[in-house]
C-alpha cells in the first residue's frame, strides 16, 4: 500500500465539522417516539438509552468529553457536563461498594415523555443503578455543550480528582 494521497487530510478536515454536527443532533430517543412508553432491560449500553431518553443530544456526544465522560476519569472536571460524569462515576463507585456490578447488572426502566422512570426493581442494586443513570441523564439534559472539551486530551487532566460526596 502506497502513501496516502495529499488530498485525504484536506478531505478529513472538511468532513470534521459535519461529523461534529452529527454528535450534537438529537439522539434517537428525542423525537415523537420517545413519548411512547418504552420498557428497557439494562446492559452497559442502556446507560446510553437513559441519556438519549432525556437529553437533547445523542449519547455519543459524551463518549470522549472532558476528563470524566467516557471510560475512567481523573482530574478537575472542566464544565457542567464533566461534573455530571464525575457524579455518575461516584454513583457507580458507591454502587460497587454496596456489592453491585454497574457495568453488567440489569434493571427495568421506562422512557415516558423524555423522563426515565425506574422499576420495578427486583433488588437494591437494580434500584441504585437505575437512579445513577437517571441522575446523569437529568443532569446532562440541563447542560450546555462545549465543543472544546470533545476529544479532550487526557494528559491535560490532573492526576487528582475531587472527592465524591
Curated annotation (Swiss-Prot):
This is Group 10 secretory phospholipase A2. The active site is at residues 88, 133. It is found in: Secreted; Lysosome; Cytoplasmic vesicle, Secretory vesicle, Acrosome. The gene is PLA2G10. CDD domains: PLA2c. Its EC number is 3.1.1.4. Residues 1-31 form the signal peptide. Residues 32-42 form a propeptide. Belongs to the phospholipase A2 family. Secretory calcium-dependent phospholipase A2 that primarily targets extracellular phospholipids. Hydrolyzes the ester bond of the fatty acyl group attached at sn-2 position of phospholipids with preference for phosphatidylcholines and phosphatidylglycerols over phosphatidylethanolamines. Preferentially releases sn-2 omega-6 and omega-3 polyunsaturated fatty acyl (PUFA) chains over saturated fatty acyls. Contributes to phospholipid remodeling of very low-density lipoprotein (VLDL), low-density lipoprotein (LDL) and high-density lipoprotein (HDL) particles. It comes from the Eukaryota. GO terms for biological process: arachidonate metabolic process; arachidonate secretion; axon guidance; cellular response to leukemia inhibitory factor; cholesterol homeostasis; defense response to virus; erythrocyte maturation; fertilization. GO terms for molecular function: 1-alkyl-2-acetylglycerophosphocholine esterase activity; calcium ion binding; calcium-dependent phospholipase A2 activity; phospholipase A2 activity; phospholipase activity; phospholipid binding. Disulfide bonds join 53-111, 67-157, 69-85, 84-139, 90-164, 91-132, 100-125, 118-130.
Amino acid at each position: 500500500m502506497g502513501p496516502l494521497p495529499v488530498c485525504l487530510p484536506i478531505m478529513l478536515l472538511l468532513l470534521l465539522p459535519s461529523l461534529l454536527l452529527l454528535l450534537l443532533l438529537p439522539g434517537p430517543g428525542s423525537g415523537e417516539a420517545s413519548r411512547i412508553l418504552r420498557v428497557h432491560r439494562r446492559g452497559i449500553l442502556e446507560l446510553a438509552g437513559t441519556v438519549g431518553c432525556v437529553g437533547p443530544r445523542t449519547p455519543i456526544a459524551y463518549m470522549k468529553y472532558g476528563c470524566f465522560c467516557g471510560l475512567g476519569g481523573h482530574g478537575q472536571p472542566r464544565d457542567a457536563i464533566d461534573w455530571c460524569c464525575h457524579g455518575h462515576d461516584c454513583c457507580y463507585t458507591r454502587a460497587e461498594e454496596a456489592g453491585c456490578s454497574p457495568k453488567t447488572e440489569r434493571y427495568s426502566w421506562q422512557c415516558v415523555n423524555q423522563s426515565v422512570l425506574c422499576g420495578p426493581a427486583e433488588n437494591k442494586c437494580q434500584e441504585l443503578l437505575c437512579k445513577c443513570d437517571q441522575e446523569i441523564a437529568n443532569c446532562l439534559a440541563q447542560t450546555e455543550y462545549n465543543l472544546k472539551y470533545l476529544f479532550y486530551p487526557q494528559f491535560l487532566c490532573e492526576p487528582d480528582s475531587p472527592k465524591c460526596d
